[in-house]
Regions:
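Conserved acetyl-CoA-binding loop-helix of GNAT-fold acetyltransferases
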Residues: 43, 49-62, 86
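A conserved beta-turn-beta hairpin within the catalytic core of GNAT-like acetyltransferases
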Residues: 27-38, 48
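Conserved active-site alpha-helix within GNAT-family acetyltransferase domains
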Residues: 54, 66, 70-71, 77-100
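Active-site rim helix/loop that mediates acceptor-substrate recognition in acyltransferases
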Residues: 1-9
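A short, acidic/glycine-rich surface segment
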Residues: 20, 24-31, 81-85
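Conserved hydrophobic beta-strand within the GNAT/NAT acetyltransferase core sheet
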Residues: 38-41, 71-74
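Conserved beta-strand in the GNAT
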Residues: 11, 17-26, 42
């Protein structure tokens, strides 16, 4: 895994082959409290439905607790939403984007 002050990443391996990856960024909110943003959670197609994604996610959540975050946010595509709901995430708010 890679750990820096505001970034934590983890790699899942199977016999030296990368089969999953997760990363979370941390930042301090202006009004107080730290927040985590899950940037990536990827599992190779052939290794899905084996619990690897759940293990990666639990690891990211654990690190967010160590970092004393009060919440974790992420953006998800439609096929992944059920996975995140199953893991205890709630739908909330609207995300607006401005691409540069």
């Amino acid at each position: 895994f890679i750990s820096q002050k505001n970034l934590y990443s983890i790699v899942a391996l199977s016999e030296k082959e990368v089969v999953g990856f997760g990363s979370i960024f941390f930042f301090q909110r202006v009004r107080g409290g730290r927040e985590g943003i899950i940037e990536d959670l990827i599992v190779s197609r052939n290794y899905r439905k084996l619990g690897i994604g759940s293990k990666i996610l639990k690891n990211l959540i654990s690190e967010a607790k160590v970092q004393k975050c009060f919440k974790i946010c992420l953006e998800s595509n439609n096929p992944s939403k059920d996975f995140y709901f199953k893991e205890g995430f709630l739908k909330g708010g609207s995300i607006m984007k401005y691409f540069i």
